[in-house]
């Protein structure tokens, strides 16, 4: 009879060599009839049961009975880890089921799995979405947070942000020249050597005798130019403060003020930055002004500013942007001479645009390499640190496991020695008792024989003989006990 396919006669029904849970005898389940009524094909079984790991936790009766115990925590008891030995699973195999061997000791592989679980828990932070920065969280306007330009220039107003160019356009795009009017004014190209001096227009005009006036720009483009100027000012201030901080960390000695005009100009702009933001930046120079007087006035202003600064601010600013912008300054001066000689109107970009674009280009090229190198080093270091920590944890766990094994072996050896000694003593006692019993049997047998022989004599002499025999028998037993080792114990 085929017990695997005849469900009517089989006490434990099977499906494809395994037990069919749908027809399993369930006396504790309240929905037993619903289970039997579920439609199932010849090879279809309920997906709630895992046949590769048969466990009584998958039985619905066990789930219903144990469910309220885990209900406050929302734990599914069918997903609990199988303990060693299992709690809710009997060690007896079912009908026609192979006996699975269980490993009681824990190995280093399982210890490494525990370490991997801890590592996955620690790596949850890397899987989470990035947290907003503190500036973005403090910004009450959500549109500025969503705008990518707001993350780069967080301190701009809403009307200025409309005209702010994108970061990839900042390094290459130069604003178009404004339409010229009838007045023939020449706007000198600003360099990193004189841009910081000409920020304070009245002071420079007084020293150089250069008339300062606002440029002739149409009223429609004034707001756009003002926003662009403010943006250039703030961007330049931020970049120079970062360069000044890096220079303070890297440069050890300080040189005299005569060799540090670049650093004095940059530090002067950082100090007087709050007085510059609301001033007009365009300056007009007439075509009759000599170029030699302009350069002399700029040098005098640089010397005055460098002499008025404290000694700490005269330290040289180690920044590649100023060194790389010297050829641009020479090109700008040659172009200015040509324009003066030919008496043509030249309208250049707002002040320090050349300096800003140069610095932004260099920063854009140099910074990502440093960031990539730093991040690669940090990632490699973090991985190596985690690997070393995991190996150290596994080594400690393995040493503790070996120590526990050694202690258990020593304890087992001590218990074995003690039990073996007790067994030897008990064996000796048993042997002594057996010898004593054999002697008593012999004496009792002899005494019974004497009693039977003298049983017919009822005289007084026979009674005395019996009493003497009994006393002699007791004395013999006492001597036997004394002679044996049991008397001492």
Swiss-Prot record:
CDD domains per record: bZIP_ATF2 (cd14687)
Species the sequence originates in: Saccharomyces cerevisiae (strain ATCC 204508 / S288c) (Baker's yeast)
Major location (coarse): nucleus
InterPro entries associated with the record: bZIP, bZIP_sf, bZIP_transcription_factors
Subcellular location per the Swiss-Prot or TrEMBL entry: Nucleus
Gene from which the chain derives: ACA1
Biological process according to GO: positive regulation of transcription by RNA polymerase II; regulation of transcription by RNA polymerase II
Keywords: DNA-binding, Nucleus, Transcription, Transcription regulation
All residue ranges annotated as the bZIP domain in the record: 384-447
Induction: By nitrogen limitation.
Family from the record: Belongs to the bZIP family.
Region: Basic motif, residue numbers: 386-406
Protein name: ATF/CREB activator 1
GO CC aspect terms: nucleus
């Amino acid at each position: 009879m085929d017990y695997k396919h005849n469900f009517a006669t089989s006490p434990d029904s099977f499906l494809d060599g395994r037990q069919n849970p749908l027809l399993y005898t369930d006396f504790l389940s309240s929905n037993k009839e619903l289970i039997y009524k579920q439609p199932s094909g010849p090879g279809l079984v309920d997906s709630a049961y895992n046949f590769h790991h048969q466990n009584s936790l998958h039985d619905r009766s066990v789930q219903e009975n144990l469910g309220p115990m885990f209900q406050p925590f929302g734990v599914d008891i069918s997903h609990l880890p199988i303990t060693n030995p299992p709690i809710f699973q009997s060690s007896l195999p079912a009908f026609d089921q192979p006996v699975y061997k269980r490993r009681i000791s824990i190995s280093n592989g399982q210890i490494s799995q525990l370490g991997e679980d801890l590592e996955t828990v620690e790596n949850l932070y890397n899987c989470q979405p990035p947290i907003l920065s503190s500036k973005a969280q403090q910004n009450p306007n959500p549109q500025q947070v969503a705008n990518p330009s707001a993350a780069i220039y967080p301190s701009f107003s809403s009307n200025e942000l409309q005209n702010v160019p994108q970061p990839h356009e900042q390094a290459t795009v130069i604003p178009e020249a404004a339409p010229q009017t009838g007045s023939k004014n020449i706007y000198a190209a600003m360099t990193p050597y004189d841009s910081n001096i000409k920020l304070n227009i009245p002071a420079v005009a007084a020293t150089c005798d250069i008339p300062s006036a606002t440029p002739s720009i149409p009223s429609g483009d004034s707001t756009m130019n003002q926003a662009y100027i403010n943006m250039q000012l703030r961007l330049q201030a931020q970049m120079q403060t970062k360069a000044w901080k890096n220079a303070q960390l890297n440069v050890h000695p300080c040189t005299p003020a005569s060799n540090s005009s670049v650093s004095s100009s940059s530090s002067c702009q950082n100090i007087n930055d709050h007085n510059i933001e609301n001033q007009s930046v365009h300056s007009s120079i007439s075509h009759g002004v000599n170029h030699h007087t302009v350069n002399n006035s700029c040098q005098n202003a640089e010397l005055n500013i460098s002499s008025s600064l404290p000694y700490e601010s005269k330290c040289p600013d180690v920044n590649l942007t100023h060194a790389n912008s010297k050829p641009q300054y020479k090109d700008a001066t040659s172009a200015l001479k040509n324009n003066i000689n030919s008496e043509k109107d030249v309208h250049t970009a707002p002040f320090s645009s050349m300096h800003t674009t140069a610095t932004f280009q260099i920063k854009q090229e140099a910074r990502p390499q440093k960031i990539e190198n730093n991040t690669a080093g940090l990632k490699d270091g973090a991985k190596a640190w985690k690997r070393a920590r995991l190996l150290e944890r596994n080594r400690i766990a393995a040493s503790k496991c070996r120590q526990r094994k050694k202690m258990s072996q020593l304890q087992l050896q001590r218990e074995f020695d003690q039990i073996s000694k007790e067994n030897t003593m008990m064996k000796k006692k048993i042997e002594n008792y057996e010898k004593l019993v054999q002697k008593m049997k012999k004496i009792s047998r002899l005494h019974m024989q004497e009693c039977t022989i003298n049983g017919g004599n009822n005289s007084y002499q026979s009674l005395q003989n019996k009493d003497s025999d009994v006393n002699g028998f007791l004395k013999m037993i006492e001597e036997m006990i004394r002679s044996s080792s049991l008397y001492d114990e």
